[in-house]
Amino acid sequence: MTDVALSQDVSRFLRYLGVERQLSPITLLNYQRQLDAIIALAGETGLKSWQQCDAAIVRSFAVRSRRKGLGPASLALRLSALRSFFDWLVSQGELKANPAKGVSAPKAPRHLPKNIDVDDVNRLLDIDLNDPLAVRDRAMLEVMYGAGLRLSELVGLDIKHLDLDTGEVWVMGKGSKERRLPIGRNAVTWIEHWLDLRGLFASDEEALFLSKLGKRISARNVQKRFAEWGIKQGLNSHVHPHKLRHSFATHMLESSGDLRGVQELLGHANLSTTQIYTHLDFQHLASVYDAAHPRAKRGK
């Protein structure tokens, strides 16, 4: 079996994912990138057939990937794609067992999410509203910080998802789970301002937030605009949508201490995902202690 034949098997798998599983083009592209990298590694190891692949060869793929500078998280993604591919080959009767089943990547160090402090959030939101797109951006910033939305949830908002009388939005989160969220008085105010101007761009588009071309704004466009506003407003740290979500979670937890409530607002399936913010909260408390407690003031 040549590299071409190896690639043909991968192409068949990708067609299966696209047609039968109906995965998104972005997900398919990610699978293709990972499996193309595996095919290149297979060429380095002299692998001629997927049937020749065993756990030792899969481990060699992992080692070679690490030597090429692939981080633990990216390696885990690559091995996950390979396991899915081998599972499919097993289902097709082309492999007896999945050789990647017992091979795992080293655990990635868990970095605490960085957040923006309250003063910087206020400075970020105090933007120059000299054009309709700036009003749109202010509304997006207010909604993102006011409800802790994921970027995909923000760009996926339609006008029909709003209830401005109650100050709530309906969002579709991960796993097609819908949740109803309060967004706060300021977010409602700026959505109303944006809706007054939105007709300048489109009238028959369902999306709440539009690009200057009158279409649903893209995630990339939101990232770009938020970063630009961070620079314009003089923030020291890079502003991206997920950092606003982190800031929402951290500030909510610091104020309320209600971990379960924050979990529901963020749409986390597992409490353990939300618990990372307790570490951020502890860091805040520890810094207060070190600055204020007499026993913490060493050498004074």
Swiss-Prot record:
Q: Which InterPro entries match?
A: CB (IPR044068), DNA_brk_join_enz (IPR011010), Integrase-like_cat_sf (IPR013762), Integrase_catalytic (IPR002104), Integrase_recombinase_N (IPR010998), Integrase_SAM-like_N (IPR004107), Recomb_XerC (IPR011931), Tyrosine_recombinase_XerC/XerD (IPR023009)
Notes on how activity is controlled: FtsK may regulate the catalytic switch between XerC and XerD in the heterotetrameric complex during the two steps of the recombination process.
**Residue ranges annotated for the Tyr recombinase domain, each copy included:** 111-290
Instruction: Give any Gene Ontology cellular component.
Output: Holliday junction resolvase complex
Q: Which UniProt keywords apply?
A: Cell cycle, Cell division, Chromosome partition, Cytoplasm, DNA integration, DNA recombination, DNA-binding
Question: Is the keyword Cytoplasm in the record?
Answer: yes
The UniProt GO MF terms for this protein read: DNA binding; tyrosine-based site-specific recombinase activity
According to the entry, every stretch annotated as the Core-binding (CB) domain falls at: 4-90
Task: Show the Gene3D superfamilies listed in the entry.
Answer: 1.10.150.130, Intergrase catalytic core
Output the SUPFAM superfamilies linked to this UniProt entry: DNA breaking-rejoining enzymes (SSF56349), lambda integrase-like, N-terminal domain (SSF47823)
Q: Which domain of life is it from?
A: Bacteria
Single GO BP term: chromosome segregation
> What compartments host this protein?
Cytoplasm
Give the record's family classification.
Belongs to the 'phage' integrase family. XerC subfamily.
Cite the record's note on assembly. Forms a cyclic heterotetrameric complex composed of two molecules of XerC and two molecules of XerD, in which XerC interacts with XerD via its C-terminal region, XerD interacts with XerC via its C-terminal region and so on.
Q: What does this protein do?
A: Site-specific tyrosine recombinase, which acts by catalyzing the cutting and rejoining of the recombining DNA molecules. Binds cooperatively to specific DNA consensus sequences that are separated from XerD binding sites by a short central region, forming the heterotetrameric XerC-XerD complex that recombines DNA substrates. The complex is essential to convert dimers of the bacterial chromosome into monomers to permit their segregation at cell division. It also contributes to the segregational stability of plasmids. In the complex XerC specifically exchanges the top DNA strands.
What's the protein here called?
Tyrosine recombinase XerC
* Species name: Salmonella typhimurium (strain LT2 / SGSC1412 / ATCC 700720)
